[in-house]
Amino acid sequence: MVVNLILLLGLLGGYLLVMPAITYFYLQKRWYVASSLERGFMYFLVFFFFPSLLLLSPFLNFRPQPRKI
């Protein structure tokens, strides 16, 4: 019973906090330079982790980077 509870809490923590944070940093680094296949993978990640990305949504920032002249 205790092992199941620990496993469930670990999976829940991974789904709600760890993987969305990794997804967020990946999207932030690759959003403007991704190929079409990579962009499809990004959309899949956002779809798959959508409920947990809502927890991180106040911190998401996808504003365009300033241009370098």
Curated annotation (Swiss-Prot):
Membrane topology recorded in Swiss-Prot or TrEMBL: Multi-pass membrane protein
Q: Which residue ranges does UniProt annotate as crossing the membrane?
A: 5-25, 40-60
E.C. designation(s): 7.1.1.-
What's any one GO cellular component for it?
plasma membrane-derived thylakoid membrane
Cell compartments where the protein resides: Cellular thylakoid membrane
Q: Which InterPro entries match?
A: NADH-quinone_OxRdatse_su_L
- Which reaction is catalysed here? a plastoquinone + NADH + (n+1) H(+)(in) = a plastoquinol + NAD(+) + n H(+)(out); a plastoquinone + NADPH + (n+1) H(+)(in) = a plastoquinol + NADP(+) + n H(+)(out)
Q: What's an example of a GO molecular-function annotation for this chain?
A: oxidoreductase activity, acting on NAD(P)H, quinone or similar compound as acceptor
Q: What's the short name of a Pfam family annotated to this entry? A: NdhL
Keyword tags: Membrane, NAD, NADP, Plastoquinone, Quinone, Thylakoid, Translocase, Transmembrane, Transmembrane helix, Transport
PANTHER family recorded: NAD(P)H-QUINONE OXIDOREDUCTASE SUBUNIT L, CHLOROPLASTIC
Oligomer and partners: NDH-1 can be composed of about 15 different subunits; different subcomplexes with different compositions have been identified which probably have different functions.
Q: What does this protein do?
A: NDH-1 shuttles electrons from an unknown electron donor, via FMN and iron-sulfur (Fe-S) centers, to quinones in the respiratory and/or the photosynthetic chain. The immediate electron acceptor for the enzyme in this species is believed to be plastoquinone. Couples the redox reaction to proton translocation, and thus conserves the redox energy in a proton gradient. Cyanobacterial NDH-1 also plays a role in inorganic carbon-concentration.
Family per similarity comment: Belongs to the complex I NdhL subunit family.
Designated name of the protein = NAD(P)H-quinone oxidoreductase subunit L
